[in-house]
Amino acid sequence: MAELKNRIFYNQVMDKSAIKQLIIRLVACLGRVCTAHILDQLKTLGFQYSTQTGISLGIDDLLASPLKNWILQDAENEANVSQEYCRHGYIHAVERLRQIVETWHTTSEFLKREMTVSFNILDGFNPVHMMSFSGARGNVSQVHQLVGMRGLISDPQGNIIDLPIQSNLREGLSLTEYIISCYGARKGVVDTAIRTADAGYLTRRLVEVAQHVVIRNVDCNTYEGIILRSIRTRQGNAYLTQENRIIGRVLARPLYFGKRCIAVRNQDIGPDLAAKLSIISPQAILVRSPITCKTTDWVCQLCYGWGVNQGKMVSLGEAIGVVAGQSIGEPGTQLTLRTFHTGGVFTGDIANHLRAPFNGIAHFETHNCKPTRNRHGRLVWKCLQDLTITVIGQGKKHSLNVPSQSLLLINNNQYVESKQVIAEVRASIAPIKEKVQRNIYSYLQGEVVHTRSALRLSNAFSGTILLIHHNPNTGHLWIWSGKLYQLSGQQASSIYTSEDFIQTNITVANKRYLKFDTHKISNKKVLKSVLIGKFTRFKQVKSIQTGTVRSVLIQKPDTLRMVVLSSVDQLEITMHKTPYIMEPLLTQKISNNILNLTSYPKSSTLISKQKNTVSSFASIHIKRPTIGFQFQLPIVPKIRCYSLGLLGKLQRPLQYNLVLSSPTQPIFIDRYYNTFTNWCYLNEHGNSYNLYGLQMIVLDKKLYNNNSISGLFNTYRNIPKIGQLICKGTFVQQTTQLSESGKIVSIFKHKIVLRLSQPYLLAPGTFIHPDCYDVINRGDIVITMMYEQLRTTDIIQGLPKAEQLLEARSFNEVVLKLENDFVMLTERIARQLRSLSRSYMLSTKESTKHSQIDLVNRIQTVYLSQGVRIVDKHIEIIVRQMSSKVMLVENGDPLAVSSGGLICLPLPPIGSFLPENWIEIPLSYVIDNHTFLPRELVELTRAQKINYVIQNPVAYKPVLLGITKASLNTNSFISEASFQQTARVLSKSAIKNRVDWIRGLQENVLFGRMIPAGTGCREISSQLQYGNIFQKKWAQHTKWKLFVNSFGLNLSCLQIYLHFQAYCLESTNEQPQSNLHVHNSRIFPFTTICSILKS
């Protein structure tokens, strides 16, 4: 306490955090009563000056940044560019979403920083500026929405809407922006109603699991502890420093600076000592913790440390378990309500950027980089190791150090401008991501075409089989534009045959299609001769069998007419079928095909001179009459005709299958042969050379002038072909650029006819819903993409994550790490000790300790990300209850758990030695319950004490229980039944014949007894009962004081009080109702204490 009194008060700006530190120092130095008077005077001073200032809010005080317009224009241009790239098929929808989200988030953060600068420059005494930045009312995010822009909004499912709100609340919202803002309004209402209940239920579970934890004794005499380090963010900035974490803790070991002892064991750490220790030994400060406390059902005073609101050692009888549960659960309710004020604004983190210091040329070594594709779809360089980028320009030279795994957004020797982003630095800690899926919908109505092969999968959905395709590689999916027309079932069934009678006002004519079976066309390929030269040609002979179907493409769709009779009640219709020739000839041209050789001669083989044949094919003329059908319908007078539009789906040209009624004519092919002779020589690469075609020309020696030619460049031009798919923006000529994407249908001399199409870039792992050549409408789901995105830092995400950690789900990283560490440590220790029976005991202890510290840090990080700090001791108490059980396994092998059999404990022989700490639990408690089942949960301390006694130790493995399961596995079935599953707990306890000793707070409350906390604690009641005896005997025995002073013992007043109380009880021959738990639960006489102290 003397450390706080020596502090000097500095003249500084008293914001919210400074006033908080001032109050802490006032309470520690002057006490609570004096602090209350000082704070009253401070409050009066604040109201007095705020009244004189006359701070009030008006619309004129909401000053917007003058840079907002061009910043938003620049962001819109970037968003439009990414949208165009997505339409071209260069990037897929997820990359476009990432780029848009990060662009607008960067713009919003830049406006937020400019808002602070503009307030300081334009009006430093602006009421909005003073209230928000002093912490009196509002925060920076709320002021940013007033004068900056609202930015990106999350929908109720937590997904980010890619359309940002560019307006602020002062300018007013448009209709679209107002509808998007309603998501945030509804989100606040849902959080207030539902998430508050979740936070309250979380508080109930936390209190339930630790309600029996009370400070019962002073010291458990443990030498173990934990090392607390700074908790850092993903960017590396410290959230919570080590100095703040060790304040109020007790040292587990003495600390030395050289040969000088700067702190002794069991010494509490104040603010000044914490500042010194963090500087002298920042990585090796071992402090005592409730996790390492040796007591079974409670925590000792030194392992807990300072009280939360006292600034001194915690009192005996303090119900620290209830305080811990309330301290963790209560911020959840506050943070839930905070969502209402921010309105669901996205506040994700992005990568750190390196920018160019000035204009110049950037140089770096490319052999340490490899090309890759970043999350925005851009081609970048990935650093394989640490890299140095040197920027040279304007007579200056500057070097930038880029760490490994970073992405370079520029090329070597590229000109960069000042403040241009040249690299993205990967965060030191990976950001929290989640896998989500995004459905991509069709912008066009048409036909789906895959450019890559896909794997067919089956998925049961709503009782039907949904066939989807899984894309293993990167590719494109095209939608060819077209129109879709559908007819109802009544129109399809309104076709009548000859001699039928019909009624009035119904459709009497319709068109139908005939389906016929087809025969395959057999191709017979005959290899006539092989020419080893530039090309290899084959002869093909096709024989078309009789009855082969010819597929005719109907280019012009027919119209459907509906005839409605109005004058005659009944009418007889006569239908005649008149054959006609629809397409008289079938012309099939077989061109010269270029095929690859399946076998080659060996290298350096001379082929003999032979006669080679080169064939050229003429056109094949086939005379094949086809038979079609035509319906004739006589129409009576007074008939009205209505057009129904087109029939069927015309996404692509319809195919009509027609049957040949007459055999085809034979095919006549004229064959032409050309012959030549040549020698050829094959090298090992398979290229052919004409030996006789080489000539050597010898020229006279002449003098030539060396002239340089500059301005040379290569010109590339795409040669369009029919059926080719071309993206928007492609140059088909040197100056002609396509304005739309499509498929080339026909090519003329001065124009190209395209079929309008829309490309979609497919990433690996994308699911394709329609089959190839399927027809879809506009707005149908085309593909589903799986990707990772940053979690929004909001309590909707934060509170379930904290609950997930506290409930220790099976997929939790801490649970998986505990199992892996246990297996690894068991195998390592077994190799050293060569004893599996003892190695798992050490591995269980170490792996459990590592998981406990990791879980404490993870829970602390969740709350720190919301701006709330929880004292580590509260989380440690909850984690201690979660990890206090172990699971018994069979066959002495903790790595192999079986499901059957019994574990019987051999009883120790009579008269065998028992350890001293075993006396705390009656031996009959173990002997009477010597049978256990595999996978049964037993307390870790009980399992350790059992293994101290028996010859063959029982094998067990560590487990991490959630707070719900830990509440249902306690020593009190009364507490379990009052929490959950009352009937199950009571029936199971009755079968097991369990006994409840009613030691916890909840059990005593249920039976109306005094709770064992505070004045109801046995230690405190003993002090009150024997207080008068203590006061009388204290004045008589001054020998005790002299003895203590002569030895210079550093005993606390509480320890002296307890020792002397034990002496008073012994001298009056009165026995207390309970032990005082001093020196292994024994009451020592005064002479014994003196002998111990002398030794």
Curated annotation (Swiss-Prot):
SUPFAM superfamilies named among the record's database cross-references: beta and beta-prime subunits of DNA dependent RNA-polymerase (SSF64484)
Q: Please list the cofactors this protein needs.
A: Zn(2+)
TM segments?
A: none
Which Pfam family, any one, appears in the UniProt record? RNA_pol_Rpb1_4
Q: Which residues bind Zn(2+)?
A: 220, 293, 300, 303
Its domain of life? Eukaryota
Q: Which cysteines are joined by disulfide bonds?
A: none
Q: What is its EC number?
A: 2.7.7.6
**GO molecular function per UniProt:** DNA binding; DNA-directed RNA polymerase activity; zinc ion binding
Going by the UniProt record, its keywords in alphabetical order are: Chloroplast, DNA-directed RNA polymerase, Metal-binding, Nucleotidyltransferase, Plastid, Transcription, Transferase, Zinc
Classify the main location.
plastid
Show the InterPro entries listed in the entry.
DNA-dir_RpoC2_beta_pp, RNA_pol_Rpb1_3_sf, RNA_pol_Rpb1_4, RNA_pol_Rpb1_5, Rpb1_funnel_sf
Top enzyme category: transferase
How is the cofactor bound here? Binds 1 Zn(2+) ion per subunit.
- Cellular component, GO, one term: DNA-directed RNA polymerase complex
What Gene Ontology biological process does one annotation of this record name? DNA-templated transcription
Its catalytic activity?
Answer: RNA(n) + a ribonucleoside 5'-triphosphate = RNA(n+1) + diphosphate
Family to which this protein belongs = Belongs to the RNA polymerase beta' chain family. RpoC2 subfamily.
Task: Briefly state the protein's biological role.
Answer: DNA-dependent RNA polymerase catalyzes the transcription of DNA into RNA using the four ribonucleoside triphosphates as substrates.
| Subunit description | In plastids the minimal PEP RNA polymerase catalytic core is composed of four subunits: alpha, beta, beta', and beta''. When a (nuclear-encoded) sigma factor is associated with the core the holoenzyme is formed, which can initiate transcription.
Name of the protein in question? DNA-directed RNA polymerase subunit beta''
Record organism: Zygnema circumcarinatum (Green alga)
The uppermost taxa in this organism's lineage are: Eukaryota, Viridiplantae, Streptophyta, Zygnematophyceae, Zygnematophycidae
